[in-house]
Amino acid sequence: MDLNNRLTEDETLEQAYDIFLELAGDNLDPADILLFNLQFEERGGAELYDPAEDWSEHVDFDLNPDFFAEVVIGLADSDGEPINDVFARVLLCREKDHKLCHILWKE
């Protein structure tokens, strides 16, 4: 993989959020979608992390943090606080030529 051909952090967040919005209707409870839409402006967010270790239970490849990122999308108790009501965890490959995405949805 090419370190010079990676999505920036902002591009990674934007791509994960776009995928979340596109697929949320098929994967989240309607009440959760309504809550997210009503509360996102005040206390919603998307946070970028290195992939958590538990992804190894869901995917069968090396999650090198140089090329993979986890984006947590959800709601916090208040603006500026960490997300504690997680609606989706999105695993993305950051290499621009390698489109790969896995999502763990709120149950």
Swiss-Prot record:
One Pfam family matching this protein: DUF440
Organism encoding this protein: Serratia proteamaculans (strain 568)
Name by which UniProt lists this protein: Putative double-stranded DNA mimic protein Spro_2690
Known role: May act as a double-stranded DNA (dsDNA) mimic. Probably regulates the activity of a dsDNA-binding protein.
InterPro entries in UniProt: dsDNA_mimic_put, Put_dsDNA_mimic_sf
Family affiliation: Belongs to the putative dsDNA mimic protein family.
Lineage per the UniProt record: Bacteria, Pseudomonadati, Pseudomonadota, Gammaproteobacteria, Enterobacterales
